[in-house]
Amino acid sequence: MKKSLIFLVLLFSCTVIAQSDPKVAFQKTRYELAVSCYKKADFVKALDLFSIASKIKPENELGKESIKKVDTLKTMLRKSIMDKVIGSWKMNGNQPLWSVNATNTNDTDGIDELVEINQKQILFYEVDTKTKAKKLIKTEDIKYYNKEESDALFSAIILSDGTIWNCSLNEDSDILHVINIARQTENGVEKIKADNLERFYSKVN
């Protein structure tokens, strides 16, 4: 009876290991590809791949090492984008400047929307286009959104009203694109999958 029990335990263990091998193999390929991207300085792609690897089997060594890489890369990428967005930005509308359909909601009332970004805060202003008088509308602390430790999202911020905005820059770092991707409510985070509110800002020299 005792030998039969030991045999069943060993059989079960071997079955579990066999079932998990494909996952470990896939995790290993994601990790190795992430390392390759990291060495090529493709940090955004590396972050995405390390994130995937960390979620496959978070309890093993590759999973633990991957989550460390995720944290390191998030910090690195956030510093990089922060260094570029510090300064003043004028809101252009809901589409890129080159788009023929771009609309600037400020054109009709003689008011420009301006944001000033520093290391800790975002200050929102209204500027009279005629008098150039600047009025502070609100101030938001910069708080990065982190749903999960292993999440690859590094440039999303959450505002005091619960809206979550993903931020990105163009190659020249003179156009800031923000898009409302979700909203945090009492019931949790609700993703916005269609008709997302977008804004484009141009850097003010």
What are these regions (language model features)?
Residues 81, 95, 110-127, 205:
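Flexible low-complexity loop/turn motifs enriched in small/helix-breaking residues
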Residues 74-90:
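N-terminal helix-cap/turn-to-beta initiation motif at the start of protein domains
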Residues 19-79:
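Alpha-helical protein-protein interaction scaffolds
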Residues 180-205:
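Edge beta-strand at a domain terminus
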Residues 91-92, 195:
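Acidic, glycine/proline-rich Ca2+-coordinating loop motifs
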Residues 100-108:
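Surface-exposed strand-loop-strand hairpins of Gram-negative outer-membrane beta-barrel proteins
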Residues 1-23:
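Bacterial Sec-dependent N-terminal signal peptides
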Residues 24, 94-101, 119-186:
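Contiguous, well-ordered beta-strand patches that form the walls/edges
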